[in-house]
Every structure is written in structure tokens, then in C-alpha cells.
Amino acid sequence: MSQVTARVLNSGMRLPPLPTIRELVKLYKLQAMKQLSQNFLMDERLTDKIVKSAGRIDPRDIVLEVGPGPGGITRSILRRQPQRLILVEKDRRFGETLQLLRECASPLDMQVDIYYDDILRFNIEQHIPDTTQRIHLIGNLPFSISTRLLINWYADLAARRGAFRRNDTCMTLTFQKEVAERICAPVGSEQRCRLSVMSQIWTEPVMKFIIPGKAFVPKPQVDVGVVKLIPLKQPKTQLPFSLVERVVRHIFSMRQKYCRRGYGTLLPPDSREETTQTLFQRADVRDTLRSFELSVPQCLRLADAYAEYIKEHPEVEAYDYRGPKNPDVSGAAAASS
């Protein structure tokens, strides 16, 4: 860090004055695009609160922001002065606005990198090869990709790859209020679903606060929840992510019925009832519970039981209850039971 920059930071000087986000939107004739699920957050008190929810951001840290748009949250991040800020934005219309923010950050020795890319395809590991610096993931997520992105990141977290090669990469993200509540839903809650269990296997999700829809432009028909997801230091399972995700997805496919109904669809019909009962006994889980009444340990014991079963009957792993009937798989499983 240069002596000039040190003096700037020590003096408490802030970023140079910029047009407000509302002025920038008007200046560049920016309009939110429905197909990109865009909603702009104009209130800097709220963007500051989102970034504050991420916790301490040190001068050596890297922040990756998803979908900065006109730069509301971006400005709040820059005030925290990370060493590097990576912006991943799919919509090139925001280029001039984001370039202006980069120029304002440059005198303070903050590196701002802008990538016009789809976060679902963005290779974080390629752009952040160094694992000595802590990473924060922050974003006002488009509603249309939020669940898919989160599941992708959980897969990375389970494999210790991408942004999660260290075990301290926290995610501070916005979701539709209903989705945010599902992520954090406890056992027995009517809102508990696949996303609840997957989130709670690999992270500790914390609902930070709710933003009313009227704070966004254009105003969405729903309120928004800000959730911080803190990776667990010790994972709750060593099973492959894909297997756990498959089992949990099947369990919750019939969430209002007894959990054995959804779980049973993992198995060919010829041996389904008997095998399902056996696996529930192995897992020490009552099969008359409904899926939203299952705890994370119970779901993982059911995943363990299924993993052991497909070791004994490898042909069952390929079974897909939605596909065409496969007498070879059903017959083989029944014969070997």
C-alpha cells in the first residue's frame, strides 16, 4: 500500500462523491429486465446493512459480488475497503456505471475486476487461484437462479472447490422471503423442504433481516430476505454430494405424505415396499413421519442406508422411477433381495 493511500485511509476519507444509484439509472436509461429477474435496490442504508451482515471484511479479503447491476451493494462493499472486489454481471448495460465505480476505487488501492458472465458458469477457482485470502460471496440474486446457484455452491462446498477451498467462505445473499424462510426452516415447520435440509447439512443459515418489496425498483410482488450462510467447520456427512442430494430430493417429493413414500421411489417397484421398510429400520427412522418432520441426522441416516444398499445391489443406483419401466433392474433387485 502506498504512503498516499495509507494517509487517505487513515484520514477516514471516503470514496469520491458519485451520482446516486437512482441518478445513474436515469442517466444511463437503465431499466430492469424481467427476463433477468432484475430488481434494483436504491436505498444505501439497506445496501450498507446487507454488507454489514457479511461480517468483518479485512483489507486482505476478496469479495465476489453476484449481479451488481447499477452498483448499489457495490458501493457499500467498497466502503469496507477489501483488497479485491470481483463483480460478475450478466447484463452489459451496466458497464459504464461499474467502470465509474472501479475508477473511484483505484486511488485507494482497491482492485476491482468486472466480468460480464453468467454466475452459473463462472469459474471462481480460475479467477481466484490463491487460497491464502478469505473470500466473501455477496449478492442481490436474481430470483430465477437463486436456488440453482445455491445448490451448485453447496456441491462446491462439499468438494472443497471453487470459492470453498478454505472453510471460511461465507455467503450473504438475498432471496424471495419465502425461499429465505425455507432455507432456515426448522424441523416440523410447514416450510421445511429439500433446500432447508441441503442448506443445513453444509452450512448454518441465519436470517439476518427482511427488506420490503417497495424498497426495490421495480417493486417485486414479494418481500426479500437476507440470509447469511456460514460453512460448517466439520461436514455432517462424507457421502457424495450427488447421492445425498438425490435421497433428499426423493424424500421431499411427496412432502405431505409419509416420508417412506418419497424415499421408496429410489427403489424398483418389485421390491420397493419390503426394501423401504428394511432401510428405515437400518436408519432407525420412523417411516410414518412426514418429510418436513425429519431432522438432518435422520435424513443422513436414510442416505447412509441407501448408500449401503446400492453397494449390495449396484444395479439399483441407475433406477429412475420417472423413466420407462426396466424389468431387468426390478427383476435383478428382487432376485438378489
Curated annotation (Swiss-Prot):
Q: Does the keyword RNA-binding apply?
A: yes
Q: Where are the transmembrane segments?
A: none
The record's annotation in SMART domains points to: rADc
* Cellular component annotations (GO), alphabetically ordered: mitochondrial matrix
EC number, UniProt record: 2.1.1.-
Q: Which UniProt keywords apply?
A: Methyltransferase, Mitochondrion, RNA-binding, rRNA processing, S-adenosyl-L-methionine, Transferase, Transit peptide
- Please list the residues that make up the transit peptide in this record: 1-84
Main location per the UniProt record: mitochondrion
Q: Which GO terms describe its molecular function?
A: mitochondrial transcription factor activity; RNA binding; rRNA (adenine-N6,N6-)-dimethyltransferase activity
Please cite one Gene Ontology biological process associated with this protein.
mitochondrial transcription
Mind telling me which PROSITE patterns this protein's record contains?
RRNA_A_DIMETH, SAM_RNA_A_N6_MT
Q: Where in the cell is it found?
A: Mitochondrion
Give me the residues that bind S-adenosyl-L-methionine, please.
38-41, 67, 89, 118, 140
Q: Which family does it belong to?
A: Belongs to the class I-like SAM-binding methyltransferase superfamily. rRNA adenine N(6)-methyltransferase family. KsgA subfamily.
Q: What is this protein identified as?
A: Dimethyladenosine transferase 1, mitochondrial
Q: Which organism is it from?
A: Drosophila pseudoobscura pseudoobscura (Fruit fly)
- What are the leading ranks of the lineage? Eukaryota, Metazoa, Ecdysozoa, Arthropoda, Hexapoda
Q: Name the gene for this chain.
A: mtTFB1
